[in-house]
């Protein structure tokens, strides 16, 4: 059986490491502060924001959420961001994506002060990532690296294949792997013979947003498989096919009306991989944990205590 890379365990380790740093900041003057901007009432985004705010509360980080309506204009949202940039007690600003179509997302993300950009999306911080300079790293890619390192997975000299080229996951995780001396290939929808490329990977990262697309045929025996996907499958027939009619999984489907399935075939990965991240409970918990890491680090830099 392959080894499971347990994101919940690593998350708890990181939270334990953050607590004394947060206490030191509070003793120095004030705790770290995080502001989350959530536009409109997207149910999935609301869940993510609630989880972030709860984690802040658990750790002793000051947090607040700003919830403008989904009719907001780019200029109005820019004014909110600029106001948060100016507030001394706010160390981190997160603008929850996606934004409504009338809002210029790039302008909003560029308006966040690079020093308070705890998502790692500002061009200045992306440039620092490329140059391997200290700066906030995108949370999900940073979490993936923590899972690999704390899980004892060798990176240097390994062949890594990243399936997906998004600015949020694919590109930054490829760069982080490169900085750790892996040989990295990025694949996408136009990549020919994807299956054979994936089969060469010692570390395979799937971040494409398609449920169970990466089957066992894509996986090199013994490879480490990182599944970034979070796909809610509401088609019972499809869920049954993916889980090979597992009675336990189908009972869960009937209870909830859907199943959360990653980008990797959950049965095929068990048959082929040497280690893998489950969905849920793999990469997901680390995304919020690394947001907390970035917020605390920002507070330390701004307080001059790091």
From Swiss-Prot:
GO terms for biological process: L-histidine biosynthetic process; methionine biosynthetic process; purine nucleotide biosynthetic process; tetrahydrofolate interconversion. Belongs to the tetrahydrofolate dehydrogenase/cyclohydrolase family. It comes from Solibacter usitatus (strain Ellin6076). Homodimer. One of its GO terms (molecular function) is methylenetetrahydrofolate dehydrogenase (NADP+) activity. GO terms for cellular component: cytosol. This is Bifunctional protein FolD. Its EC number is 1.5.1.5, 3.5.4.9. Gene3D superfamilies: Leucine Dehydrogenase, chain A, domain 1 (3.40.50.10860), NAD(P)-binding Rossmann-like Domain (3.40.50.720). SUPFAM superfamilies: Aminoacid dehydrogenase-like, N-terminal domain, NAD(P)-binding Rossmann-fold domains. InterPro entries: Aminoacid_DH-like_N_sf (IPR046346), NAD(P)-bd_dom_sf (IPR036291), THF_DH/CycHdrlase (IPR000672), THF_DH/CycHdrlase_cat_dom (IPR020630), THF_DH/CycHdrlase_NAD-bd_dom (IPR020631). The keyword Amino-acid biosynthesis applies. The keyword Hydrolase applies. The gene is folD. NADP(+) binds at residues 164-166, 189, 230. Catalyzes the oxidation of 5,10-methylenetetrahydrofolate to 5,10-methenyltetrahydrofolate and then the hydrolysis of 5,10-methenyltetrahydrofolate to 10-formyltetrahydrofolate. Pathway: One-carbon metabolism; tetrahydrofolate interconversion. It comes from the Bacteria. Coiled coil: none annotated.
């Amino acid at each position: 059986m392959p080894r499971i890379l347990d994101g919940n365990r690593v998350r708890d380790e990181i939270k334990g490491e953050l607590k004394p740093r947060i206490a030191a900041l509070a003793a120095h003057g004030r705790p770290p502060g995080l502001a989350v901007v959530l536009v409109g009432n997207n149910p999935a985004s609301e869940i993510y924001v609630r989880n972030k705010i709860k984690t802040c509360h658990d750790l002793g980080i000051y947090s607040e959420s700003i919830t403008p309506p989904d009719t907001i204009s780019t200029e109005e949202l820019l004014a909110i961001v600029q106001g948060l940039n100016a507030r001394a007690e706010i160390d981190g600003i997160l603008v929850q994506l996606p934004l409504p179509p009338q809002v210029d997302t790039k302008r909003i993300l560029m308006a966040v002060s690079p020093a308070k950009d705890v998502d790692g999306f500002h061009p200045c911080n992306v440039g620092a990532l490329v140059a391997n300079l200290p700066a906030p790293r995108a949370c999900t890619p940073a979490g993936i690296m923590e899972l690999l390192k704390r899980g004892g997975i060798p990176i240097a000299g390994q062949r890594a294949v990243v399936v997906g080229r998004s600015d949020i996951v694919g590109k930054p995780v490829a760069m982080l792997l490169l900085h750790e001396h892996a040989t990295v290939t990025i694949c996408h929808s136009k990549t020919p013979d994807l299956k054979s490329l994936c089969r060469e990977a010692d570390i395979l990262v799937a971040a494409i947003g398609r449920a169970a697309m990466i089957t066992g045929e894509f996986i090199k025996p013994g490879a480490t498989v990182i599944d970034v996907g979070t796909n809610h499958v509401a088609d019972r027939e499809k869920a049954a096919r993916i889980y090979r009619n597992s009675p336990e999984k189908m009972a869960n489907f009937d209870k909830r009306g859907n199943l959360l399935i990653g980008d990797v075939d959950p049965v095929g990965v068990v048959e082929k991989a040497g280690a893998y991240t489950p969905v849920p409970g793999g990469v997901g918990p680390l995304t919020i944990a690394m947001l907390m890491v970035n917020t605390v680090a920002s507070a330390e830099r701004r307080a001059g205590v790091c």
